Amino acid sequence: MKKSTKLLAGIVTLASAMTLAACQSTNDNTSVITMKGDTISVSDFYNETKNTEVSQRAMLNLVVSRVFEDQYGKKVSKKKTEEAYNKSAEQYGASFSAALAQSGLTTDTYKRQIRSAMLVEYAVKEAAKKELTDADYKKAYESYTPEMTTQVITLDNEETAKAILGEVKAEGADFAAIAKEKTTAADKKVDYKFDSGDTKLPADVIKAASGLKEGDISEVVSVLDPATYQNKFYIVKVTKKAEKASDWKKYKKRLKEIVLAEKTQNIDFQNKVIAKALDKANVKIKDQAFANILAQYANTDKKASKANTSKSDQKTSSDSSKDSQSSKSKSEK
């Protein structure tokens, strides 16, 4: 079952991290396995496995988990962790236990993984809030489309979708009636309201609707369903479209949500926040086998510094060019 293998990206590594932690908290000479003429100690096992990719990732996850629990643990309640766990369990239904087992997890290790992710998410969101500027709002406003009322046909087959597109675009066609009859959406829903920053439908579908005028019908929009790895096909009609106000401040609250969502999903920004937390925790690696596990975060500030330097150089170059042109103009006079 494909669904059970996608529990969480990298989730199995936390279970491995727990194994490493257990090794470190036990006497190095403690026997893990005994046999005739030999034994395998905790130290033997640790040295054999510490250089593997799984162990490297596991140690990184363990470090990040401990650091964020220390710095942000009070900001995310255990109740919220339980709620997130229960929601995930409900989504998987009867296959949840199998998904855990296939990923090498127990209920406790999965909850720890969820909590670690929630702590990082909290830290990233708070950092994003502090960096919000009017320029961010204005940029988001430029591509923002206010609420649209739409009718959406969801289909599983491209040829069928093309045929139905012809039907709904025919003169006098009743789009709503055809949509209700033909859609293959599980809940048979065809009526939607959303703005350009919404996530209730695939991004490409919302983008297509945003580009339509009131009364227009889109072409067939093909979207890969991440749950099934199969393409879904959509046809959208915009039945009502709110006029966009000229002042971005009218949408400030909504634009804030959109900007924060974009920032928190940005990998470079996430790494920057994690790097700052690791630096604050003064993480020191004692075993050289794990010397490079934080490398991706060590370069974060350098990238930011390089980007800022580049912008500064461009500004200096531009200013110098303007000064040169000004001097030339005065000389000619």
UniProtKB/Swiss-Prot annotation:
Annotated signal sequence range: 1-22
SUPFAM superfamilies cross-referenced by the UniProt entry: FKBP-like, Triger factor/SurA peptide-binding domain-like
Lipidation positions, renumbered (S-diacylglycerol cysteine): 23
Annotated keywords: Cell membrane, Isomerase, Lipoprotein, Membrane, Palmitate, Rotamase, Signal
GO biological process: protein folding
Membrane topology annotation: Lipid-anchor
One function term, GO molecular function aspect: peptidyl-prolyl cis-trans isomerase activity
Residue ranges with Low complexity bias: 323-333
Family indicated by similarity: Belongs to the PrsA family.
Lipidation (N-palmitoyl cysteine): 23
Residue span(s) of domain PpiC: 145-240
Name assigned to this protein: Foldase protein PrsA
Known catalytic reactions: [protein]-peptidylproline (omega=180) = [protein]-peptidylproline (omega=0)
Taxonomic path: Bacteria, Bacillati, Bacillota, Bacilli, Lactobacillales
Entry EC no(s): 5.2.1.8
NCBIfam families associated with the record: PRK01326.1, PRK12450.1
Record's function text: Plays a major role in protein secretion by helping the post-translocational extracellular folding of several secreted proteins.
Native source organism of the sequence: Streptococcus equi subsp. zooepidemicus (strain H70)
Encoding gene, per UniProt annotation: prsA
Top EC class, one word: isomerase
Any one GO cellular component localisation term in the record: plasma membrane
